[in-house]
Design a protein with these regions (language model features):
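Histidine-centered catalytic micro-motifs used for acid/base chemistry in nuclease
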Residues: 41-43, 52-63
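Short, charged surface segments at domain edges that flank catalytic/cofactor-binding sites
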Residues: 2-40, 67-69
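Short linker/helix segments within small regulatory modules
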Residues: 60-74
Length: 117
């Protein structure tokens, strides 16, 4: 039996490439915050030893910026609460407006620097 894809389904993210991108975003996060044993949500600065409660979020949308899909600099680490909160607040408006992420993160200078690198 085949199931229909929902109207929001974006197609396969290329499992291996996506997993590699996600891993690289988390490793970059550890280097940027200077903590070798921890990952950090950039909104709340909460340290985590595991990635189970964290998400890698694309700064420039997966849909609209295909050339940046697998660029590890096009990702930030957010806790699940922040990640879901961002998408609840901005829905699809954020797809072509990466600056909405900065707005959501309160325009924090450290966050601006983090995203610019």
């Amino acid at each position: 039996m085949r199931f229909k894809k929902g109207n929001r389904w974006k197609g396969s993210k290329g499992k291996l490439r996506y997993k590699t991108w996600r891993k690289n975003v988390f490793e970059l996060n550890k280097r940027k915050v200077g903590l070798s044993k921890y990952y950090v949500c950039i909104k709340f600065n909460k340290k985590r030893k595991t990635t189970r409660v964290l998400h890698a979020h694309h700064i420039f949308s997966w849909d609209r910026f295909q050339e940046r899909r697998y660029d590890s600099k096009n990702g930030v680490v957010l806790c699940i609460k922040c990640h879901n909160g961002f998408h609840r607040k901005y829905k699809f408006e954020a797809l072509d407006k990466p600056n909405l992420l900065l707005e959501y993160l309160n325009g924090n200078q450290a966050v601006k620097d983090y995203i610019k690198e």
